[in-house]
From Swiss-Prot:
Keywords from the named record: Chloroplast, Plastid, Ribonucleoprotein, Ribosomal protein, RNA-binding, rRNA-binding, Transit peptide
Coiled-coil zones: none
The protein's name: Large ribosomal subunit protein uL4c
Primary localisation category: plastid
Gene3D superfamilies tied to this protein: 3.40.1370.10
Organism of provenance: Nicotiana tabacum (Common tobacco)
Length: 282
């Protein structure tokens, strides 16, 4: 049986359809990455149909996102993912060493004439209740990543998942009251399986939509503020509203827009430095 490409593997990984968790895919060696998996990373404009609330196709839209080159896309996405995961670690695990554990100051029995092995403390690492050898200590696991590099990783993952993406009309006002059954019926009208992992990206989410979807364990409801790389890679289907598509095209669009933002930031910094120099001269 030939290996298949899932949504998870569409950007960086080759996965088995029987694998349900992302942890099996995080540490595959480059030798296990097929040419087909690399070829799915695209940079061209994706045309996606727009579905109505009833599931009918009412038009189409384009998703024009910047993607990393084929030879570096896997490394960019992998770096963005591992950085996010490392930055989520608290690093608060702590153990007591032999010098920190309470007690053990007195010698338990004389050095000689007991027939037993010599022992100077009851808090040796060899004894129960003793100190821990090479145990964990509080540590900062965070890793720095350039903003542009992180944005490139997200846009590459989104653009490579266009085949598993659908665009729908705004449906916030369609739910007059919270009803999970109605939301599941809506997913099926859009061709989504409630048992598959789905990611909904909306610029504005009403309370009724949140309450109707939160009991579906395979569904993630995100906004532009909570959009992250792990949830994109961990989902099998991606559902975008029309306003979310406009946001993605504006935020993760072509390189010129990114350069313009950097120039604006540089101008702001230059202006701040000029003001400081003026104040110092006065």
């Amino acid at each position: 049986m030939a290996a298949s490409l899932s949504f998870f593997s569409s950007s960086i990984f080759l996965s088995n359809p029987n694998i349900q968790s992302s942890k099996h895919l995080l540490f595959r060696s480059p030798k296990q990455l097929s040419v087909a998996a690399i070829a799915t990373i695209r940079s061209e404009v994706a045309t996606i149909p727009i579905l109505s609330f009833d599931g009918a196709e009412v038009g189409s839209t384009t998703l024009n996102l910047k993607s990393a080159p084929l030879d570096t896309a896997r490394a960019v996405v992998h770096r963005g993912l591992t950085t996010d995961l490392r930055n989520q670690r608290r690093g608060t695990a702590s153990t007591l060493t032999r010098s920190e554990v309470r007690g053990g100051g007195i010698k338990p029995y004389p050095q000689k004439k007991t027939g037993r092995a010599r022992r100077g403390s009851n808090r040796t690492p060899l004894r129960p209740g003793g100190g821990v050898v090479f145990g964990p200590k509080p540590k900062d696991w965070s890793v720095k990543i350039n903003k542009k590099e992180k944005r490139l990783a997200i846009s590459t993952a989104l653009s490579s998942a266009s085949e598993n993406t659908i665009v729908v009309e705004e449906f916030n006002d369609k739910f007059e009251k919270p009803k999970t059954k109605e939301f599941i019926d809506l997913m099926r009208r859009w061709g989504l399986d409630p048992k598959e992992k789905s990611l909904f990206l909306m610029t504005d989410v009403s309370d009724n939509v949140i309450l109707s979807s939160r009991n579906i364990g395979t569904l993630k409801m995100l906004t532009p503020r909570t959009l992250n790389l792990f949830d994109i890679l961990d989902s099998e289907k991606l559902v975008l509203t029309k306003s979310a598509v406009d946001f993605l095209n504006e935020r993760y669009g072509d390189e010129n827009e990114w350069e313009d933002e950097e120039e604006d930031d540089q101008e702001d910094n230059d202006g701040g430095e000029a003001e400081e120099s003026t104040e110092s001269s006065e």
